[in-house]
């Protein structure tokens, strides 16, 4: 069991390792992007709130996937405006809640999709590849290094 005084530092270490690996894959290997800003918040969730439903693999993967798709869709049919940005985030939040795949960091993905004007390729890299890597690393670090019962359930 990790002591209460050490736990914040352990959580930070876990989150930092995940982001460092995703950064390495993005910047040091010719594989494409594996990292987006919202993964920083995801790393916080899987280490600080690892027992929460929001931190479970299904929510991470499907929340990010659904939210980026919503952002790309809205970006393709509406011009960038306060209305389109609000609609994209609101729709992503509603759909995550409806399908019980809420992952709060993923609510930023529609904004990323619209402001960066991403293509459909963004779905595979970084969303699918990065989410799966984040999930696998979080599992390995939480389960085997920190001896935590993570995840509660896979799907």
Which residues does each PLM region occupy?
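Pore- and pathway-forming membrane helices of multi-pass small-molecule/ion transporters and channels
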Residues: 34-49, 89-119
């Amino acid at each position: 069991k990790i002591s209460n005084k050490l736990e914040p530092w352990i959580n930070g270490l876990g989150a930092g390792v995940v982001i460092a690996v995703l950064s390495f894959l993005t910047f040091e290997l010719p594989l494409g992007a594996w990292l987006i800003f919202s993964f920083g918040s995801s790393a916080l969730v899987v280490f600080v709130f690892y027992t929460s439903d929001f931190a479970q693999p299904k929510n991470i993967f499907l929340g990010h996937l659904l939210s980026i798709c919503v952002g790309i869709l809205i970006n393709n049919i509406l011009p960038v405006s306060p209305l389109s940005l609000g609609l994209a985030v609101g729709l992503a939040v509603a759909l995550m809640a409806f399908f019980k795949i809420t992952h709060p960091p993923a609510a930023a993905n529609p904004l990323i999709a619209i402001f960066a004007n991403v293509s459909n390729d963004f779905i595979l890299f970084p969303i699918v590849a990065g989410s799966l890597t984040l999930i696998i690393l979080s599992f390995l670090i939480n389960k085997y290094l920190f001896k935590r019962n993570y995840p509660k359930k896979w799907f």
